[in-house]
Regions:
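A detector for small-residue-rich transmembrane helices and their helix-helix packing motifs
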Residues: 1-188
Length: 188
């Protein structure tokens, strides 16, 4: 069993991400210093793979991620425990950023980490009912829809967007893999 005492790290992450957004608004060049871009590798600025997770490009971007982290993060943290939740969050987020930096000029946001949470929940709680696109559906169906939308977006079906679909797809793939690796240890 993967559980350990719940310390509500998902709620602390919500607070930290929100505070970082306030700093982005108040401090000129704050975002530029922590943003993930090509210089992260060429200039040995490896902290950017982590710090970019806490940055957001707009209030809408922030609110979508906070909403998803609140609902999915709390559920996963209760299922696998706080320490394991943090491992999934940071492992998915950093690895998704390592992949995304090869496709985008710059990248920011917690989406890769959150999609990792979603991916793991898809494996360990596939029939959990979630509300998305105005409907209630099983988690695995919602994930198929989200994956399909991101694949189509990556292929340009929706025109040019600022959405990091590669980070989304990488995060959910990592979360699904982690879910299969550890699902035998998760209490059902």
């Amino acid at each position: 069993m993967l559980k350990n005492k719940n310390k509500f790290y998902s709620l602390w992450l919500l607070l930290i991400i929100s505070l970082v957004f306030v700093l982005q608004l108040l401090i000129p060049k704050f975002t530029d210093f922590f943003l993930l871009n090509g210089s992260a590798l060429t200039n040995f600025q490896y902290w950017r793979f982590l710090t970019a997770i806490f940055l957001h490009g707009s209030l809408t971007h922030l609110l979508f991620n906070l909403f998803a982290l609140f609902f999915f993060g709390i559920i996963l943290e209760k299922e696998i425990g706080s320490k394991n939740f943090l491992l999934v969050f940071f492992f998915s987020g950093i690895l998704a950023n390592l992949i995304a930096v090869n496709f985008y000029e710059s990248s920011l946001g917690a989406s890769g980490a959150i999609y990792g949470i979603i991916g793991m929940l898809t494996v360990i709680k596939p029939l959990m009912m979630v509300w998305t696109f105005g409907m209630i559906m099983p988690m695995f169906i919602a994930s198929i829809i989200w994956i399909t939308a991101d694949v189509l977006r990556t292929l340009g079906a929706f025109g040019t967007t600022n959405i990091g679909s590669i980070a989304h797809l990488s995060g959910i793939a990592i979360g699904i893999l982690l879910g299969f690796l550890f699902r035998g240890f998760v209490k059902r």
